[in-house]
Amino acid sequence: MLTVTGLWFDHERTPVGLDHTPVFGWQLEGNCRNIRQTQYRLQVALTPDFAALLYDETCETGNSTAVHAAGLTLQSLQKYYARVQVWADTAAGPQQTLWSEPAVFITALLDPAAEWKAEFVSAESPETCRKSSAGTMVRAAFTVKPGLRAAYACTTALGLYNVYLNGQKVSTDEMTPGWTSYNRRLLYQTYEVTAMLHPGLNMAGAMLGAGWYKGVMGLTRSRNNYGDTTAFAMQLTLVYADGTRETVNTGPAWQGTKAPVIFSEIYHGEAYDAALELPHWAECETPENTPAGRWHAVHTVPYPAAKLAAQAAGKVCVQQRIPAQRVFTAPDGSIVVDFGQNMAGRVEITVQGTAGQAAELRCFEELDADGNPYLANLRKARTTMQYTFARSQTVTWQPQFTYMGFRYALVVQWPGKPEPANFTACVLHSAMQPAGEFTCSEPLVNQLNHNILWGLKSNFLDVPTDCPQRDERLGWTGDAQIFCETACWLADTWTFYSKWLKDLAVDQLPDGGVANVVPNIEETHTEANWLMKNCPYGASGWGDAATVIPWVLYQMYGDDTILRSQYPSMKRWVDFMRANTQNGLFDFKMQLGDWVALDAEPGSYFGATPTALTSQAYYALSAQLLALAAEVLGNRQDAELYARVHRQAAQDFAANFFTLDGAMTAQTQTAHILALRFGLTPQKWKQKTIQRLLELLEQQNGHLVTGFLGTPYFCAALSQNGCWQQAYDLMLKKDYPGWLYQVLQGATTVWEHWDGRRPDGTMWSAGMNSFNHYAYGAVGAWLYGECAGIGQQPGTAGFCAARLAPRPGGGLRWAQAWHQTPFGRYALQWQVDDGKITVTAAIPPNAAAKICLEPGAKLLETDGLTFAEQNGCPTAQVSSGQYRVSYTMEQ
């Protein structure tokens, strides 16, 4: 039976707080082959019985993944119900589904500049706020009349906040409102809170922390980067049965006081003094929660409503809870808690103590060669959490307004003897659905894939950060763009990246240059840091996040809305590069190039590949992607213009970086990788370039010496040019430098440096030695797309037409992967058994694929498929369903 599943809105199942009409999509499920949608009927209504229809449209189309409901008009702060019915052709004949289960989305304020009336209120003292990182609380009582039908709270803060109604935390969200360039864009969250209110007197309250807004942040460790006063704003809309609406807004009538959070910052952790608690403080006033002199009037803080933007999904919350594996005493006498996994988040403690006693932990990543806590790589970050008791009791507590990167926790203070049961790690990251899994016969590669995934989890906390542990944790654009494709294989990152790309665009400089970190917290401090002073923005491979990430998202999800929204930003970046060319080559200030490559001069972070070469390669790539985006959007004039820009950039690359006999002027691995991967090698010199890359690899005994820009593409540059064995050999290297070396050293996430920990247990320089740095995990895309073999046919997007091309090798007995696409799940497995290779493939309904076997494959089983040779490979065109074929290789 054919059914509709997973109706979504803007790639989310149940978004709350949309400020626009969403894009719709759905998936089909059926137990027969060749399912192809021919027609759909989409309805949107105000009630779950669909009696109050707002939209009812039937379309003859196969489109099921990026459907626009033209003519649908939405209202602010309203719940909507949607359902879809589908007609399809199948191998069993035409079929029609029943209506899908109703799916729900809720709108935010569609025009906050006009509709937002709430003021930002603060309980901080103007005399002390600039130096304070203490928390505060604000609250106010309000009355709800009988007949309440719905209630929606729109909330945000300058700083971090948790909001409560009648003593109950409104949501499980953490670290709200997230991190943006607050002076340009501030997100607000929308919550349906009907069930939390009752007729009569109610109480609203919020607790605030310094967060990214005013705490110490950035390479210069500056504070008050966006302002010096935390403030909270709430606009609570009450909708009554008769249709009338009223609002409860923050304003001067609210009251404030100090919170038991006496200190909280992103880098340094949090301290909590239970003596300052007010029990039931966010409930209606009692003598207990309203002691004389404790609450005082708030003051208002101006903020333009026009800069507010709704956040409907992708918010940070506790995604996993990991119990401690052991508590042990290190050789130096330190008491250490081990959670067995490097991660980002907090530690929840359950502890018994008496008044004045404290429980204090310091989170860290690694043990040194002697088995003692290794803290040096945290630099100035204190990463400490402390709870001080007010009376004799047992408490369960975790920080609210900070997070740490850690596997271990050093017990600094503890009443009694700590046991594993006292500690639970709470993993924090932005909400994302899993999108794929890769496994193979080599356990070390499986652990590598695990490490890559945990690098994503640890660094996708509202923004794509470089690392979660030290005093940095910034949204480096280069790291983000090189990891983006891998991230999309692992998780549904559409919402996460879409949010961050808006931040990138608003932080773009007037000349079109892109900041090296987004949000650009460093923009007013560049003179205080050597790197930022010499390379304040416009770094190739970093700024190209403006073009690469939107294009990758379009390719992976097939939704051109990301190109439409980001196209002005993409164009400004390419025009910035065009305006800063000298003799045909992009040249702007100091460039970072192949950052931390192993072929760098001793003591330098700059790889041996000339930055002029890496800059020109990315200039050509970005111009090409912009031309392709313009083509998708129907902008023929721009498509032709930037195609010419790309051709000229490629010609200038060849003229400057190839000699007359076809040798590259830079004899580095990265130079050859980028030339091949970006299509910048003149065809007549392609084989020579491939051969020279193999020679450079052999000179290093099969090891890479590449940095940030070369490493992500190394395996693909080999395999896509026929060098499969070398690609597998590179991936499977077990000694330094290589991906599996880290695994054998006990890594549970990907490291910043290939030798972060050396075989003798000594460490790389503590100044830059993160053990949770996802950049080199970009090789994950190769595992899914090349090793397992799930790819797309040229000229397509969103996996409407896949190319399933398994390529056994490397001595692996089997490999398998699945990937969740807008159409549903693709799965591919290959297995080698005594010379026989068996391939099992699954294609979701309404999609199609080509199964492309290895050149020289001699078919044994075809499962009814017809294979014909294409480009030297036995190839079969298939529609949805499950297939199993087998073959041997001709000798």
Give the predicted meaning of each segment.
Residues 160, 233, 251-253, 257-258, ...:
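Active-site acid/base region of carbohydrate-active enzymes
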Residues 106-110, 173, 617-635:
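Conserved, charged catalytic cores of large soluble enzymes
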Residues 151-155, 165, 346-365, 401, ...:
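Alpha-helical support elements that line or immediately flank enzyme active sites
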Residues 35, 98, 135, 156, ...:
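Active-site-proximal structural scaffolding
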Residues 224, 228-235, 247-286, 309-315, ...:
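Non-catalytic C-terminal accessory modules of carbohydrate-active enzymes
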Residues 1-79, 83-470, 478-479, 495-496, ...:
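Extracellular/oxidizing-compartment recognition motifs
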Residues 161, 170-172, 177, 504, ...:
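Active/binding-pocket-proximal capping segment
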Residues 204, 208, 272-273, 279, ...:
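C-terminal capping/lid segments that line or modulate ligand- or cofactor-binding pockets
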